Amino acid sequence: MLSQLPMISKLLFVILILFILQALGGYYQVKNYRATVREIHKLGNVGIGQKKGKFFNGNIVMVASDSDGIIKGVVILDGITFLSKFHSVDEFLGKPLVGSSIYSFLEVTDGFDKKERKQYMGWIRAFEALRTRFEAQEDSAELEDAENIEEV
């Protein structure tokens, strides 16, 4: 059947098949992302960071921690195709993750130069997302305390 089609029709057919495969792959990747977010959220507060790559070196990092900033679990998605899946990570910069404080990693990453920050951007954004969440919770608690004092 394909041998009877003109060359341009064959090319369009191949492009259509690739488009359909990409759409299906995108669907399953979003489904995997949502399931992973639900699963890691069970461990505590979640910070998500993304490093966009031009072609091959992007990633998505999810860090779960308790309200004190102690890491309970980390997963990362890195790969070049829609077939990539999240996997657990035990270490970052040669240090164990689970049981460590996000603040200890933020101290290290705050000292990174521009090139290192770019390389570890997904990690940095995940840690910073948690720090921002905890600071907002502290500010909210302080505001609530101040309002309670004013009422008395």
Regions inferred by a protein language model and the residue ranges of each:
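Single-pass alpha-helical transmembrane signal-anchor segments
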Residues: 10-27
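Glycine-rich, charged/polar anion/phosphate-binding loops
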Residues: 46-50
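Cytosol-/stroma-facing membrane-proximal "stalk/adaptor" domains immediately downstream
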Residues: 103-152
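Acidic, Ser/Thr-rich low-complexity segments on the non-lumenal side of membrane proteins
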Residues: 51-83
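Short, strongly hydrophobic alpha-helical membrane anchors
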Residues: 1-9
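Transmembrane-cytosolic junction motif
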Residues: 24-44
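Flexible, solvent-exposed short loops/turns enriched in glycine
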Residues: 70-113
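Intrinsically disordered, low-complexity acidic regions enriched in Pro/Ser/Thr
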Residues: 2, 36-43, 88, 93-96, ...
